[in-house]
Structures are given as structure tokens and as C-alpha cells.
């Protein structure tokens, strides 16, 4: 055995370099199967929100540019800058393929962003990420006590919330007052994005009620951050939040009251439901014993090198007595969802990789199916046949399954009705001076 020379350090002497890399967290093998920023959050919830926000933010930016000024944003309940990242992650759909900068809201367009939150730890995390930008500021304040602005502060163009923030208004009166303040402070034009927990999410079917004066607030337990075994081990340590459940009908009532109080119109531009069968508490079944871990299944579709069991994606909706309209709606969604999965499994079963063709003719989707379902089925047929030539790199796991995930996402995005039938209900409003 040769001896180590002065110019050839012993292997063990080099190990601290790896230890330092591990401590930095940069060597961590991050999974999108669980956690706050799982695959559903990144590829479904964030992107669905961005898709609905895009046309409104596009028009707002055009308006600011025509007035020779830049956009001012007030993010209420900013957390660790999640809202800022959601907005700056919106892509400009008019960008050319050769463009490198495709963000809609760039630093060039941003005049000022202020994030407001009551949690100091989240604010410190946000500041560590973006505090170096002089056009970004974070402030500790409770927006349920009113708009956290001083009398002389310039009005904002966009008043933004995300991921159920407005459900912290346990009493509608505080939200009415806040929205009225925004309307009163609007000098020319403002856009308001309101984000609540949906009243009729399948996740908390046991809380459904036909009397909107009941079950207005829920005891929301933050148990989804753990897997099933850890969840029970930490049961006594779990955080509980009191959060308002909101339907579209209730949201419209609150906004109408705020408009009346302000003496100005607050016009609804649209509502959308986010995460119909993929809300976080589908996997915990905390509020619905019939809930299935569909979110985990969808996370698996988008996880690299991981093969998903199609059976884990099949929904078996259990109706709730006394809610015929909701039962019909969820039954319809379930049938569309399951049909797309079964169709894709059939494609995989009859496709021959060696011959790069289907062994048997693939039937066309029935004309009675909704247009979006027919479209997604046809696209999945192209996906399966289009990657048949890939004999390495796990084409099913890394190409076909993610595309099925996106097809299911398009299905839910198209068939949602913005009524509060999902984990999140988002309303977009505008205030315009006469």
C-alpha cells in the first residue's frame, strides 16, 4: 500500500467538505410528496391561481403603464412572502419562445410591495429572502383590525390575499370594514383578490350545512404536515386555527355590505374554486371519514422516478344526505376524473413499445362526454404514443404520469364553478372611481 504524500491528503481529511455541504441543506433530497410546498401546491394550486389571476393582473399592469407609473401591492397575510412569489411567478403568455425573461410582473414593473402579517417568524423568513430589495417591505400588523396604513400613505393598486388568508376574519363585520376601507382609499382604480376556505369542500363534508348561520367557522387543525403515523404521535402538539368557511353567496353578501358602507361599487370580476378533490385534508380525513388520500396520489404523479398506482387516484364519492345539488356536482366531477384515469390506464395496457403502436384500435371518447374530458383523453392518447420510442429514463414515471396530472388539473380547472366547493374559494374584485 502506498503512503499518502503531502500533496495527496488522506481521504478522511477531505470529508469535512461533504459534511459542510450536508449541513447547508443543499444536499438534501427534497420530496414533493408531502409538506407545505408539495407537488400539488407547486404544480396545481399555484398554477391554477396564476392562470385565473393572469388576465386581471395583465390589465392592471397595462393601466399603470398607460399612466406612466409602476404597480403598488399590499399583500395582507403575506406569510413568508408566499403571495409575492405567487404573483411574480405568473408568466407572460405573450412572450416569444426566444425570450429569456417571461415573468409578467418583473422588478421593472414593480413600484412597491408591502407584505403584512401577524406572525413575526414568518416575517423574518420573508425578510431574509427579499429584504434586500428596497422596493419590498414587510410589516407586522393585524389586518382583521382594519387596513394597516397610515392616513398619508399612498393608495395601492392591488390588495392581495392568498391561500385562505381572509378566513382569519372570523366575523364578517371585520372584513366588511376592511373592504370598505380599501374602496374608500381607492383614488382611481384598485384590484382586490380575496381568498377564503371553501364552505363546501368534500374534505370537511361533516361541516356542510344548508343554514348559512351555522358552522361559519371551523377548528382547522394543521395536521397535514405529518404523515399518518407521525400525525397521531404529535396529536397533542398540533396547531389549531379558527377559520371562516365561505360560499360564493356569502362572499357576495359581504362585498355588497362593504360597497354600501363605502358608498362605492365593488364589482366582482370572477370567482374560482381551487383544489376540489386535492385539498390538504383529503389525506388526513380529519373532517370526513370517507375522504381518500387523493392529494398524495396526485403528488406521486408529479414525483420523478416514482410509479403511481392508478388505483390510488380513483375517487369514490360518498353522498351527504340533504345536499342533492352538491351530491350531483361532486358525482359528475368524480365520474369525469375517474374516466380520464381509466382511459389512460387502457392506453398503457394496449400500447406496444416494441412496435411503437397500439395493439388494438383505441376508441374515440363518447360525444356525450364534456368537451374538456374528450380533449384530455385525446391528448393522453398522443402522449402515450408520443413517448413510445423512449426506452430509457422511465417514460411512464417521468413523462406520461406528469402529463396525466396536468390533464386532471385542466379537467378540474375547467369544471369548477367558483361556488366554494373546494379547499379554496377566490374572488377577484375591482373598485373604479366614477
Name every feature range the model reports, one short phrase each:
Residues 80-146:
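Class I SAM-dependent methyltransferase SAM/SAH-binding core
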Residues 70-79, 191-223:
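Conserved class I S-adenosyl-L-methionine
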